């Protein structure tokens, strides 16, 4: 039986898994830029940064695992997409980046050691071995993350949020030109889209499904019920946090001068509010947020790759990905970001469309035709966005791409994909009549 306490613990686990260090340091800059429009901007951010991943999580939990989203694609295409997804959000790019964030934003400000390659390696080794200790047995993840790490993280974040609303550092300033000239809700939507949490939801859905299965929750109706209930807990927590961080950014004029990212704004704000203790509070928040995401993503990646061969089990892949993360994290953040972004621009739209098609699947007259044709269009346009990001897109194609709606927001794929989806449904009906 899944009790109310179990729902709360699962909800807190989902919250902690999504709440990576990047999710904490990104909203303050958006809040600072949106200024007096911070409420509508944060609403847009929450819609795409919280609601969309939540919907994806429910869909994947019902299916049982993320790979079920690709079952109607050719096997090579589905496997290729998932391998790229898990490597991108996992030990090849995102997890080394999280390790670097923990090192540079949590450890170094404490001033306990010098900043050099040896210290970075030792920190990466210890940090990832601690994470591996939590993930080596997947059945302990809900317990370790939901019962221990999340409450500690919440205490620190709530302390910051309450203090920010009680004692804001500055009056809310006028919005930047981008927010002044455009509808702040739409900019917030785009900003939330850039969190890439839909990709993480595909990975985390399997963790939620296993957590429910461990409590003998296997019926679809019950999976939906408890996933929505637990997910609602995480939605409330994440939305509350994001609104707080947007407000922090909107009232940060006194400390934001010269800041190039939200992490700097957050760090300065916390240090002013809490004095010398602020450095330790900041370190605690970043380390716990980084650790929970590291545990969740690496565990999900190991679980997926363990399906390929019985010779290489979950512990083997967990150890391998931990070693990869430690190795890759020795490179700088700039290099990691430069390589990661093009991969994300390619696969994120595909993930969104896969979730959309899953909702429509039972109503499609020709499932495989709609999947293949719609995703082909999505991949073509998202590939253009990816190549354009690294300045490898031919100018002739780039000039044509600019004529598509939302191309300036990096979403040129959206309208052509929807057009192809509708067209494929009509074509599928015609094909169905022809063969009947």
Curated annotation (Swiss-Prot):
UniProt keyword Transport, yes or no: yes
This protein's GO CC annotations: plasma membrane
Entry's Gene Ontology BP terms: isoleucine transport; L-leucine transport; valine transport
Its membrane topology: Multi-pass membrane protein
Cellular compartments annotated: Cell inner membrane
TM stretches of this protein: 7-27, 43-63, 76-96, 122-142, 148-168, 185-205, 228-248, 277-297, 314-334, 339-359, 411-431
Keywords: Amino-acid transport, Cell inner membrane, Cell membrane, Membrane, Transmembrane, Transmembrane helix, Transport
Major subcellular site: membrane
The organism's place on the tree of life at top rank: Bacteria
Molecular-function GO terms, alphabetical: L-isoleucine transmembrane transporter activity; L-leucine transmembrane transporter activity; L-valine transmembrane transporter activity
Family, as annotated: Belongs to the branched chain amino acid transporter family.
PANTHER family: BRANCHED-CHAIN AMINO ACID PERMEASE BRNQ (PTHR30588:SF0), BRANCHED-CHAIN AMINO ACID TRANSPORT SYSTEM 2 CARRIER PROTEIN (PTHR30588)
Stated role: Branched chain amino acid transport system, which transports leucine, valine and isoleucine.
NCBIfam families in the record: livcs
Protein name in UniProt: Branched-chain amino acid permease BrnQ
Gene transcribed to yield this protein: brnQ
């Amino acid at each position: 039986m899944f009790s109310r306490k179990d729902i709360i613990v699962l909800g807190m686990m989902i919250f902690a898994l999504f709440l990576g260090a990047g999710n904490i340091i990104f909203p303050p800059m958006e809040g600072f830029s949106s200024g007096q429009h911070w409420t509508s901007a944060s609403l847009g951010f929450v819609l795409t940064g919280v609601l969309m991943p939540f919907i994806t999580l429910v869909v994947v939990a019902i299916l049982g695992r993320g790979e079920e989203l690709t079952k109607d694609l050719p096997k090579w295409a589905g496997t290729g997409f998932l391998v790229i997804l898990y490597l991108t959000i996992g030990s090849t790019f995102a997890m080394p980046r999280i390790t670097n964030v923990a090192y540079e934003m949590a450890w170094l400000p404490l001033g306990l050691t010098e900043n050099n390659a040896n210290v970075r390696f030792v920190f990466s080794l210890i940090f990832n071995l601690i994470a591996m200790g939590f993930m080596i047995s997947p059945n302990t993840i809900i317990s370790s993350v939901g019962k221990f790490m999340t409450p500690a993280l919440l205490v620190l974040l709530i302390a910051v949020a309450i203090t920010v609303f009680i004692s804001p550092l500055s009056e809310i300033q006028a919005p930047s030109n981008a927010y002044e000239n455009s509808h702040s809700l739409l900019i917030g939507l785009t900003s939330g889209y850039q969190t890439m949490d839909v990709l993480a939801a595909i990975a985390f859905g399997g963790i939620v499904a296993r957590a429910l299965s461990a409590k003998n929750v296997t019926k679809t109706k019950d999976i939906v019920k408890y996933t929505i209930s637990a997910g609602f807990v995480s939605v409330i927590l994440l939305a509350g946090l994001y609104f707080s961080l947007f407000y922090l950014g909107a009232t940060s004029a006194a400390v934001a001068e010269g800041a190039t990212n939200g992490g700097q704004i957050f760090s300065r704000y916390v240090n002013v509010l809490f004095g010398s203790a602020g450095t330790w509070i900041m370190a605690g928040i970043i380390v716990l947020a980084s650790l929970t995401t590291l545990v969740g993503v690496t565990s999900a990646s190991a679980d997926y790759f363990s399906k390929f061969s019985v010779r290489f089990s979950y512990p083997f892949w967990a150890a391998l990905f931990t070693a990869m993360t430690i190795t890759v994290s020795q490179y700088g953040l700039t290099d990691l970001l430069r390589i990661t972004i093009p991969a994300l621009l390619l696969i994120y739209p595909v993930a969104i469309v896969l979730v959309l098609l899953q909702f429509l699947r039972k109503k499609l007259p020709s499932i495989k035709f709609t999947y293949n044709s719609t995703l082909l269009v999505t991949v073509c346009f998202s590939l253009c966005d990816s190549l354009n990001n690294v300045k490898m897109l031919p100018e002739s194609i780039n000039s044509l791409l600019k004529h598509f709606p939302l191309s300036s927001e990096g979403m040129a794929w959206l309208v052509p994909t929807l057009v192809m989806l509708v067209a494929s449904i009509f074509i599928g009906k015609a094909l169905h009549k022809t063969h009947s």
